[in-house]
Amino acid sequence: EEAMALLRRVGLEDKAEEYPRKLSGGQKQRLAIVRALAMQPEVMLFDEPTSALDPEMVKEVLNVITDLTRSGMTILIVTHEMAFAREVSDRVLFICDGVIKEEGSPDQIFTCPHDPSTIKFLSMVL
């Protein structure tokens, strides 16, 4: 019952009887999120959750993560999806070569970055 509720939450209820090999990359990623949610975590970490997905699958995974943030769950995301990071974040850290170069609100980082590496990166991706 709990598993079905979690599958429903990520839009996979109709795939409950499917074998993993029959699922798309985005569906497998959402299923991984279901497995993590089954542990009832207080915090979830996503490390480039869309990097291995086809472009058409990216949105479905980002929608699930957005829903989790709206439900109040604390989430740490390592991502190059800057528009997404800006939309869902309360706080943004820009890390370059393992060093935190800049930290602030999405507005601070995306509209008025100070560090040259942040400025350069954002000019290339936005």
Which residues does each PLM region occupy?
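Conserved signature/switch motifs of ABC ATPase nucleotide-binding domains
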Residues: 18-21, 39, 71
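Catalytic Walker B motif of ABC-type/P-loop ATPase nucleotide-binding domains
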Residues: 44-47
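Helical segment within the ABC ATPase nucleotide-binding domain
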Residues: 59-71
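H-loop/switch region of ABC-family ATPase nucleotide-binding domains
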Residues: 79-80
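A short, surface-exposed alpha-helical micro-motif characterized by mixed small hydrophobic
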Residues: 85-87
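ABC ATPase "signature
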Residues: 103-104
